Structures are given as structure tokens and as C-alpha cells.
């Protein structure tokens, strides 16, 4: 079993819940993909990093991250996987709002000004979270070269309409829901 297949099995085993769920978009779903159960799992997180690095291998970027909280463990997994390959990248966290104390930053981590960055999300239904991060990154002077997610729940066209490449490791139908 390769990394992509092993990660998919892990998502199916640990990341899919059934019931009535309200998504961050306000929409309702009978199944919920809770990828924090995957991206924060000690066995599966390294797979997340390796699989996303492979999926985005045709893009050139030197930092990854997105809107807190879904993107945070994804960025950390990619940071560690890249370092293990000998090709380090930086990670950053985009806050939902600028801090009102301390350094009053919206984007935490290494400065993204003038850097080629990849915006991340664990799963995306409408694209709102990742596009909020994209807007903050552009406002900070970053060059956003694309968006990558583990599971696409329907955000692809909205991201593409913004002129950004969109990489999804899995489509919803691959999860069997």
C-alpha cells in the first residue's frame, strides 16, 4: 500500500463521522469529515505531509499554511516531511483576525512578504476559509501560488475562479460518503 492509499484508509477509519452536522459554511451534511482526527494522529500526520508534498510537487513554493485551525497541523506535517526529505520549507499560521496586543500580527511564523506560498486547508466545502487566508496572505505581500487541501467537498470551482491552481488529494466520492 502506498502513502496515498494508506492515508485514505486512515481517513476512512478515523476521520468520517455520520449524523447531522452543520458545516462552517452554514450548510448541513449527514456525514462529516473530521480531518483533525487524522492530521493530529501520530501515525497518520507524517503521511499527510508526504502525500501533500507529492501532490504539489509540480508547484514551486517555500512556505505553507492557512487559516487556523484546520490548516495548522497540515502545514506542520508538510514542514516536517520536507525537512526529512532534505528540502526544508517554512510554515505559517493565518489568524482569523489580527492580534490586538504584542506584535499585532495576522500571520504568525516567518515573514511571508515577497515569498511564494501555498495556502492549505484540511477539507473545504465552499472555499471560504482558505480564500480568507489567501486574501490575508496577499495583503501581507505574499505571492500565493495555489491552494492545496486533503479533501475537496466542493470548493474547487470557487478557488479556480480566483485564478489559483487547486490541488485536492481526494475528492469526496473517494471517501465512500
Question: Predicted regions: what is each one?
Answer:
Residues 59-70, 148-149:
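Short glycine-rich phosphate-binding loop at a beta-alpha junction
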Residues 58-59, 75-89, 156-172:
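Short acidic, glycine/proline-enriched helix-loop-strand junctions
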Residues 62, 115, 145:
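Conserved acidic residues
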Residues 3-10, 134-177:
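PRPP-dependent phosphoribosyltransferase catalytic core
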Residues 75-118, 126-131:
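Short, glycine/charge-rich flexible loops or terminal/linker lids adjacent to PRPP-binding catalytic cores
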Residues 50, 54, 76, 80-84, ...:
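Short, well-ordered alpha-helices that flank and scaffold nucleotide-derived cofactor binding pockets
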Residues 1-59:
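Active-site-facing substrate-recognition patch
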Residues 121:
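Conserved acidic carboxylate
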